[in-house]
């Protein structure tokens, strides 16, 4: 069976067992700030397992795209060198949300694996593990399925503490957890390795192919396990692993899917030996990179984009090791489409953008390598020993993306080594900084534990009443808060909008006869709306009723910006093309920010046309309508859906703007607050456009009175410019143009005069040349000269004094500029960089450079004259 046939067979089998086939979620986790990438089939169902979300099915089956690279799950360095490490893989899974449990889960797995109708694996090739106290699972395997006792292995707490086991799964330190049962396949005694639980278990003979996790308990902070009222099932089987089993190969890289990619890489790079690890790297990384880009990740220097950039560069580096020249990696997309495009049509649909992104990143990496080589060459010329410092290796790696293996290769060519210990020390420091400063946010789920949902009554009202369901202070639930206490309060119903879809949460206040609570923000925790704020008077208690009052002016301004954001999105797609996809947004009361996918900056003319389109819809003053539809009806209506977002079976469809071909100007799914008519927006004005990451642009805009303020400020600035230029309003551009041309001409004259002055000064300085250590040497101080003019003077002197050592110090205000050059015949013993480093160190400044030319600077201080006077003696010794 091919990998594609195995994937389809798995999904069809579980459909036949009453499961709903659910599409793979995006590799960018939706509404889960704790994850870098989707790395398991259960990620998209996390809220279902936590009881925070209910769907119209209780059984599901998926083939989930997963990436493990960066963060907690980082397989990157092993990829290509082992049989089963990948950055991208597919996880086949079946799930039960409080429906069936161990008996059905294990029976399904055994039936699918061994039945001749499905995979037909030999039963004598299969072994299973169970948690050592899970007698229920053991008995199901032994007494009901009929597996011999010597094929069932009990695994205890093999990770150092209670419930820390390969066969016990936990979502976190507290919360859902439970035992699991894994199924292993025996590849045969010709391959080294032992059964699970033996010293040889890390070998490749017995390979785990399926894991059945039983969410049976809730673990509390005291470590006690309490049975869940509705236990659930989460299973996972790696498609690549089961394909290797069915295709009778031991390495995942030998399955049909990878072999097509590896053979294609050989053709693209012109390589004959298909067994090289670098080919496996290119094949694996092509999958993760193409799928990540398709799911909206773009190469950048932070977060997910940084991980993608590292993977691309690692692939390109390995391609270069194989002999690839120019851009080649983007060509791997078409072979990937050949084998995975039917299952994942986003690859074909987004082919042009994926290829363009890869080409751009390859070209950028080529420039980066060139810059890194220059830096490395500079460091090597100043190296005093045989070891390149770890700090230098890390700087090349971290700042320039320079692969450490390339640094090591260059070092070996010069009979040098790299300080691997020092490099690892720097890497660990970076990891520590990342853990401290770059942790993903923790949401309120870890604090707020409320059954049921808050009823939102705020679409058409800014005030209402509600009962206090829960109060939290300092992370703990309390019954009462008093004046000065900061707290989180949950009501049974509220007019306050909770932050979602880019729109900020409402602010305002709660009040009753006993106290006032200032609401500073509103967020969601599952179905609960959490009001964050401070008690400003009196006290509030649980079960009390309060008047909930939203700040109406802030709400109205936010609504204007939210509706304008929808119009902006539609206008962008009209002007730039339908490839434009939202990548992020902020809807506040004073500004709107919209991030979108686009490879090029938006031109001034395009921005004007976008503004014109949006304001035309504002002037039209059409109604903004909402309706609740099932998801299929919403799609049929043409509603925009954000890729990677999770939508329920019933969605809120927002339509606004003029009707063209029976479709509104803008139709999107949205749960936010909006104006009633487009005219309520008043005026729309773009205030900035720029890039925030490769392939991602950002537009910031304002509406209503804020937009009027921007226009009036621009008018005032023009009026001020006219008064300075003594120009009439219709003469502004003409007068500014004339002033620019005049200024440019004056700058040229100044440059010419400075050059004449430098030539004149250079001729005078030649009389100060002296012989130091057998070298013609000029050391002098020049008054009232900036760094650029000092460089010009140096160049003039050097043109007249080629075979010499030149050291110039320029003084301007409280600054010292330094420049030194050494004729090439002297650089074996004396380096310009060393001269500048010596002077800068003595003067408390910085500087450095190449052996023949270096520059630096320092603050002017009382040591200056002494340091310059002592320089000849220093040169005598070097």
From Swiss-Prot:
Q: Which InterPro entries does the record cross-reference, listed alphabetically?
A: aa-tRNA-synth_II/BPL/LPL (IPR045864), Ala-tRNA-lgiase_IIc (IPR002318), Ala-tRNA-ligase_IIc_anticod-bd (IPR018162), Ala-tRNA-synth_IIc_core (IPR018165), Ala-tRNA-synth_IIc_N (IPR018164), Ala-tRNA_ligase (IPR050058), Ala_tRNA_ligase_euk/bac (IPR023033), DHHA1_dom (IPR003156)
Q: What keywords is this UniProt entry annotated with?
A: Aminoacyl-tRNA synthetase, ATP-binding, Cytoplasm, Ligase, Metal-binding, Nucleotide-binding, Protein biosynthesis, RNA-binding, tRNA-binding, Zinc
Report the main location listed first in the record.
cytoplasm
Q: Domains: what does the record tell us?
A: Consists of three domains; the N-terminal catalytic domain, the editing domain and the C-terminal C-Ala domain. The editing domain removes incorrectly charged amino acids, while the C-Ala domain, along with tRNA(Ala), serves as a bridge to cooperatively bring together the editing and aminoacylation centers thus stimulating deacylation of misacylated tRNAs.
Q: Which GO terms describe its molecular function?
A: alanine-tRNA ligase activity; aminoacyl-tRNA deacylase activity; ATP binding; tRNA binding; zinc ion binding
Q: What is this protein called?
A: Alanine--tRNA ligase
Organism equals Acinetobacter baylyi (strain ATCC 33305 / BD413 / ADP1)
Q: Which gene encodes it?
A: alaS
**What are the names of the required cofactors?**
Zn(2+)
Superkingdom is Bacteria
The entry's family comment says:
Belongs to the class-II aminoacyl-tRNA synthetase family.
Catalytic activity, as annotated: tRNA(Ala) + L-alanine + ATP = L-alanyl-tRNA(Ala) + AMP + diphosphate
Localisation: Cytoplasm
Gene Ontology terms: biological process: alanyl-tRNA aminoacylation; negative regulation of DNA-templated transcription
Sites binding Zn(2+) sit at 562, 566, 670, 674
On whether Coiled coil is a keyword of this UniProt record, the answer is no
Q: Report the Pfam families cross-referenced here.
A: DHHA1, tRNA-synt_2c, tRNA_SAD
How does the cofactor bind to this protein, according to its record? Binds 1 zinc ion per subunit.
Query: What is one term from the GO cellular component aspect held by the record?
Result: cytosol
Record's function text = Catalyzes the attachment of alanine to tRNA(Ala) in a two-step reaction: alanine is first activated by ATP to form Ala-AMP and then transferred to the acceptor end of tRNA(Ala). Also edits incorrectly charged Ser-tRNA(Ala) and Gly-tRNA(Ala) via its editing domain.
Listed EC numbers: 6.1.1.7
Q: What class of enzyme is it?
A: ligase
């Amino acid at each position: 069976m091919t990998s594609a046939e195995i994937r389809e067979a798995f999904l069809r089998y579980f459909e036949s067992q009453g499961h709903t086939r659910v599409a793979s979620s995006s590799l960018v986790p939706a509404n889960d700030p704790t994850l870098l990438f989707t790395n398991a089939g259960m990620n998209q169902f996390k809220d279902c397992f936590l009881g925070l979300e209910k769907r119209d099915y209780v059984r599901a089956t998926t083939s989930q795209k997963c990436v493990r690279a960066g963060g907690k799950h980082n397989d990157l360095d092993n990829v290509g060198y082992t049989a089963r490490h990948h950055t991208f893989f597919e996880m086949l899974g079946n799930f039960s949300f409080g429906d069936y449990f161990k008996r059905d889960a294990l029976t399904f797995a055994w039936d699918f694996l061994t039945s001749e109708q499905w995979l037909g694996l030999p039963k004598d090739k299969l072994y299973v593990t169970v948690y050592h106290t899970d007698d229920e699972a053991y008995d199901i395997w032994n007494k009901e399925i009929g597996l011999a006792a010597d094929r069932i292995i009990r695994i205890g707490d093999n990770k150092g503490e209670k419930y820390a086991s390969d066969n016990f799964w936990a979502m976190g330190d507290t919360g859902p957890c439970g035992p699991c049962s894994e199924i292993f396949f025996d590849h045969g005694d010709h391959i080294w390795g032992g059964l699970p639980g033996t010293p040889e278990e890390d070998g490749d003979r017995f390979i785990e192919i399926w894991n059945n996790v039983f969410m049976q308990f809730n673990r509390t902070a005291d470590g006690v396990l309490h049975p869940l009222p509705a236990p659930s099932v989460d299973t996972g089987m790696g498609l690549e692993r089961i394909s290797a089993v069915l295709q009778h190969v031991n390495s995942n890289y030998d399955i049909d899917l990878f072999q097509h990619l590896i053979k294609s890489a050989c053709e693209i790079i012109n390589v004959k030996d298909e067994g090289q690890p670098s080919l496996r790297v290119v094949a694996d990384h092509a999958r993760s990179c193409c799928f990540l880009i398709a799911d909206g990740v773009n190469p950048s220097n932070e977060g997910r984009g940084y991980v993608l950039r590292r993977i691309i560069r690692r692939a390109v580096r390995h391609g270069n090791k194989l002999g690839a020249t120019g851009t080649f990696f983007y060509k791997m997309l078409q072979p990937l489409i050949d084998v995975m495009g039917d299952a994942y049509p986003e690859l074909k649909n987004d082919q042009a953008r994926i290829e363009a992104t890869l080409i751009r990143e390859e070209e950028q990496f080529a420039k980066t390598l060139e810059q890194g080589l220059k830096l490395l060459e500079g460091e090597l010329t100043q190296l005093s020993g045989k070891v390149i410092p770890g700090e230098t290796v890390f700087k090349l790696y971290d700042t320039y993306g320079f692969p450490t293996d390339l640094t090591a290769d260059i070092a070996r060519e010069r009979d040098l080594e790299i300080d691997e210990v020092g490099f690892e020390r720097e890497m660990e420091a970076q990891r520590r900084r990342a853990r401290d400063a770059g942790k993903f946010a923790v949401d309120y789920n870890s604090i707020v534990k409320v059954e049921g949902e808050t009823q939102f009554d705020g679409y058409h009202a800014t005030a209402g009443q509600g009962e206090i369901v829960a109060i939290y202070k300092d992370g703990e639930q309390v019954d009462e808060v008093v004046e000065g206490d900061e707290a989180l309060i949950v009501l049974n119903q509220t007019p306050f909008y909770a932050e979602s879809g880019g729109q900020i949460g409402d602010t305002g206040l709660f009040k009753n006869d006993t106290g006032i609570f200032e609401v500073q923000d509103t967020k969601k925790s599952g179905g609960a709306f959490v009001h964050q704020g401070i008690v400003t008077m009196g006290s509030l208690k649980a079960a009390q009723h309060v008047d909930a009052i939203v700040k109406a002016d802030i709400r109205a301004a936010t609504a204007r910006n939210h509706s304008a954001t929808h119009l902006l999105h539609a206008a962008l797609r009209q002007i730039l093309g339908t490839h434009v996809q939202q990548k992020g947004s902020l809807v506040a009361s004073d500004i709107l920010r919209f991030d979108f996918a686009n490879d090029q900056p938006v031109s001034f003319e395009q921005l004007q046309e976008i503004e014109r389109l949006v304001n035309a819809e504002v002037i039209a003053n059409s109604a903004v309508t909402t309706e609740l539809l099932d998801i299929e009806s919403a799609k049929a209506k043409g509603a925009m859906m954000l890729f990677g977002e999770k939508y329920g079976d019933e969605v809120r469809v927002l339509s606004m703007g003029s009707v063209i071909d029976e479709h509104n100007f803008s139709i999107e799914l949205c749960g936010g607050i909006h104006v009633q008519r487009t005219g309520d927006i008043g005026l729309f004005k773009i205030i900035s456009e720029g890039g925030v990451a490769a392939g991602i642009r950002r537009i910031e805009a304002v509406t209503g009175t804020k937009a009027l303020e921007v226009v009036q400020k621009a008018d005032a600035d023009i009026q001020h410019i006219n008064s300075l230029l003594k120009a009439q309003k219709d003469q502004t551009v003409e007068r500014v143009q004339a002033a620019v041309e005049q200024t440019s001409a004056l700058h040229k004259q100044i440059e010419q005069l400075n050059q004449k002055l430098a030539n004149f000064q250079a001729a005078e300085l030649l009389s100060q040349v002296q012989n130091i250590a057998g070298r013609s040497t000029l050391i002098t101080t020049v008054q009232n000269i900036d760094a650029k003019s000092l460089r010009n003077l140096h160049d003039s002197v050097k043109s007249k004094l080629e075979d010499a050592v030149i050291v110039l110090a320029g003084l301007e205000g409280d600054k010292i500029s330094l420049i030194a050059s050494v004729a090439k015949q002297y650089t074996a013993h004396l380096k310009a960089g060393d001269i500048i480093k010596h002077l800068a160190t003595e003067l408390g400044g910085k500087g450095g450079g190449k052996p023949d030319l270096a520059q630096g600077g320092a603050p002017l201080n009382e040591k200056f004259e002494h340091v310059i006077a002592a320089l000849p003696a220093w040169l005598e010794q070097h």
